[in-house]
Amino acid sequence: MSIRYIDEIENLSGKKLFMRVDFNVPLDDNQNITEDTRIRAVLPSINYALDQKAKIILASHLGRPKGERKEKYSMAPAAKRLSRLLGKEVKLASDCIGDEVKAMINAMQPGDVIMLENVRFYAGEEKNDADFAKALANDCDVYVNDAFAVSHRAHASVEAITNCFPVVAAGFLMKNEMNYFEKAMKNPIRPLVAILGGAKVSGKIEVLENLCDKVDKIIIGGGMAFTFLKGMGYNVGKSLVEDNLIDTAMKTYEKARAQGVKFYLPVDCVVADQFNPAAETKVCPIQEIPEGWMALDVGPATVTLFTEALQNAKTIVWNGPMGVFEMDAFSRGTFAMVSAVANSYALTIVGGGDTDVAVHRAGEYAKISYISTGGGAFLELLEGKKLPGIKVLEDKGHL
């Protein structure tokens, strides 16, 4: 069944529209937002609903308050920033459920926007509790999910709440996320290349197993590469290795090779004598990692190899950095890959999280076709899983 989108709902005028957004944005010590991409990402849906004269009730979480009210996790900074971006008042409710909130919603005029307080102030949110979901729905008329980044969570404001509405739909951000994912994984223009990085194989092994059936090339960088390299018999010193996953990693490698997938691993690396920005470093081939040293970035020969592997790519999907790019000494590999991906002639899709941060830092944001707002959600799609938040929209949101 197909998902219904916000622009397919008839007559939103005067309707109370409950929209789940993801305003889980980073804050500094003074509660100032340091990066507002997630807020900007849902402006198209909010502005559409405003144009349709809907009454908009926004719900989000921020941080991990673990079912308790903690003021440092208040949605106040997000409401303030959204107010500035929309050029109109966004009222912050004192809570997300209760009589006071209900009265506030009932007093709304068409075109008003209310931001509910953090839904994770209640344990019922993460427990997907039906009673909490009903209280949260507050007799609203329409439910819209535009929070892709939390759609892999079976939480009350994402899944259970859909049972409280006659009409459920997805917003434009969700539409973008699904469209680009389908372009990459369902109907890709080939060759399709997947780049996977990050520290641990354990976080990506299911992704790898799923991608073996779909991609033409797999490029592995970051700490996770060293579990594969140790499995191939290399001495990797003190580099990060998940010994319990060596067999699994090698089976996945063999599966990819058997299916004709080209599999690229680092041929050299930047090693350090300790995990420290001021550590002594040097570049060495994979075969010559010194005893007691650890690899913290891919080396220049690897960058050349990986860049050449991207030369003929028509679709590139990337999740996970090539090294510990937060430290300058180990950032060159990741930034070189950002440049290679950004300057390719392919459709380029970058998964959220660290890779998103690296692309921003490298100043290549505008050259990437699409940067996903979801880290975990993006990974679960790559694993071939149905996300709970999307499944309920498919089940209940058909026209």
UniProtKB/Swiss-Prot annotation:
A single GO BP: glycolytic process
Pathway terms, separated by semicolons: Carbohydrate degradation; glycolysis; pyruvate from D-glyceraldehyde 3-phosphate: step 2/5
EC number: 2.7.2.3
Molecular functions (GO terms): ADP binding; ATP binding; phosphoglycerate kinase activity
CDD domains the UniProt entry points to: Phosphoglycerate_kinase
Protein localization: Cytoplasm
Pfam families for the chain: PGK
Chain sites annotated for binding ATP: 204, 326, 352-355
Reactions this protein catalyses: (2R)-3-phosphoglycerate + ATP = (2R)-3-phospho-glyceroyl phosphate + ADP
UniProt cross-references to Gene3D superfamilies, sorted A to Z: Phosphoglycerate kinase, N-terminal domain
Keywords from the named record: ATP-binding, Cytoplasm, Glycolysis, Kinase, Nucleotide-binding, Transferase
Annotated GO CC locations: cytosol
Positions of substrate binding: 22-24, 38, 61-64, 120, 153
InterPro entries named among the record's database cross-references: Phosphoglycerate_kinase (IPR001576), Phosphoglycerate_kinase_N (IPR015824), Phosphoglycerate_kinase_sf (IPR036043)
Keyword Kinase: yes
Family, as annotated: Belongs to the phosphoglycerate kinase family.
Quaternary organization: Monomer.
Official protein name in the record: Phosphoglycerate kinase
